[in-house]
Amino acid sequence: EDGRIRVIDREVSAVQGAGMIRGEIKNIDLVSRSIKEAVDAIGERQGIRITEAYAGISGQHIRSVKQPYYVFASRGGEIRQEDVRQLHDSMRNVPAPEGEKILQIIPQNYIVDDEEETANPVGTFGNKLASTFNIILGDSVAINRLEMALKRVDIVPLGLFLNAIASAEAVLTPDEKEEGVAVVDIGAGTTDV
């Protein structure tokens, strides 16, 4: 509804023993068992079979780097949606450092002709569209373990997202995000900001 996600059910299933340590999977069997318990409980209550999912990830292996990039306006000096798309597509082709995978690429701002900063450049006039992107990286092994844990219980991972960003999206207003309000998510083994 209106592009918003509506939570219809939830289930908590703790990972037993040393299956997870500080947000990282150490024992795939224990984590898979916990995922299966939660998914089966929800499936039974809702009368559905869950076969695919988006999964959240956190841990000490997560880091971010800033990467500037720019493109030139495609037509007549007006920035169009296709220019923004081209800028984003160019960033998707940036290779991850060895041993890491890109989890998310987030534009921090847009700048038109090295002068005007804007949240939405579409419809502005200029020849050059630039942005600084925040690239969220995670350790390949940690990411692969999460994907393996899902696949072991016949769940296709549709994508991964950073837990800290999901928490912020869930509780902060656009104004609070613009003002730089931080969300501190204190968990059993990790604290995400």
Question: Model-derived features: where do they sit?
Answer:
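Nucleotide/phosphate-binding catalytic cleft detector across ATP-hydrolyzing
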Residues: 1-183
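A generic beta-sheet turn/junction motif
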Residues: 186-188
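Short beta-strand scaffold segments in enzyme catalytic cores
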Residues: 1, 191-193
